[in-house]
């Protein structure tokens, strides 16, 4: 599935191995799976970010890391990873401001719509929050996440997103990326 998405043109891959059926707790398998995904990303020239695991990102020499609000101090993470890509999940203007001030390269905002990918997801914000964040932070890259599909993607970009993050859409339909590329956004 990852290789097909890479062939179809994804521009960044965030490795997130959590939840039921994940390899979390199986250190050797967890790391090997990450290494395998990293190798594929490198083969296609696509940046590989590790979700929430700074130590693993550094061990693998990944291109970066994405952290949530409960995953550690943003400034400390920036210092630890130096020049690597740092993404931060944010759910309020204050969190976006803090992430930007601490050196985040981009923020992930959402869920924009209801999502089935994350059991503990916040209440969907809709496009209004995305529009407000774009107006308040015109130069900070914003990646929208949560319930985004082919039908919703154009409105998400029109509201100010620089990119979208998808899990379910690709898992349900491996041709999602190729179909997405056909949209005139």
Language model regions located:
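Conserved N-terminal beta1-alpha1 strand-loop-helix module at the mouth
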Residues: 1-66, 71, 79-106, 122-125, ...
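C-terminal structural segments of small proteins and small subunits
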Residues: 162-163
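Glycine/threonine-rich flexible loop motifs
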Residues: 117-119
């Amino acid at each position: 599935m990852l290789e097909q998405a890479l062939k179809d043109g994804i521009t960044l891959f965030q490795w997130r191995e959590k939840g039921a059926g994940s390899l979390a707790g199986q250190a050797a398998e967890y790391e090997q799976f990450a290494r395998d995904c990293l190798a594929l990303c490198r083969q296609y020239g696509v940046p590989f970010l590790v979700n929430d695991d700074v130590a693993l990102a550094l061990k693998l020499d990944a291109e970066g890391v994405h952290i949530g609000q409960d995953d550690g101090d943003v400034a400390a993470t920036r210092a630890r990873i130096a020049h690597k890509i740092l993404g931060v999940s944010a759910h309020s203007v204050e969190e976006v401001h803090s992430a930007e001030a601490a050196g985040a390269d981009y923020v992930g905002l959402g869920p924009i719509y209801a999502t089935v990918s994350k059991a503990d997801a916040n209440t969907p914000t809709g496009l209004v929050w995305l529009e407000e964040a774009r107006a308040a932070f015109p130069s900070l890259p914003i990646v929208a996440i949560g319930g985004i599909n082919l039908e919703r993607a154009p409105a998400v970009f029109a509201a100010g997103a620089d990119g979208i993050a998808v899990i379910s859409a690709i898992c349900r339909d491996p041709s999602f990326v190729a179909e997405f590329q056909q949209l005139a956004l």
